[in-house]
Amino acid sequence: MAHKKAGGSTKNGRDSESKRLGVKRFGGESVLAGNILVRQRGTKFHAGANVGIGKDHTLFATSEGKVSFDVKGSKNRKFVSVITD
């Protein structure tokens, strides 16, 4: 009887799609109003001058200028700002 025993099933073998989070425009880069600066979960980066925050905590430029990253305050929070020319 040259039969093969049936292979068992597995509970593994799936994964979620990557969400493409992270910094999209780096320090010193020129941006236009509406450009996305950072995609994040929660406020790893906080909104500084000329930067808005979306309902999913995405940071975006509200005016034209250059991107600046700063660490401020006693809690060493990271702020993203857009410096207008």
From Swiss-Prot:
Family recorded in the similarity comment: Belongs to the bacterial ribosomal protein bL27 family.
UniProt xrefs under SUPFAM superfamilies: Ribosomal L27 protein-like
Name the record gives this protein: Large ribosomal subunit protein bL27
UniProt cross-references to PANTHER family, sorted A to Z: LARGE RIBOSOMAL SUBUNIT PROTEIN BL27M, RIBOSOMAL PROTEIN L27
Region (Disordered): 1-22
Organism: Idiomarina loihiensis (strain ATCC BAA-735 / DSM 15497 / L2-TR)
GO molecular function: structural constituent of ribosome
GO cellular component: cytosolic large ribosomal subunit
GO biological process: translation
Keywords: Ribonucleoprotein, Ribosomal protein
Coiled-coil portions: none
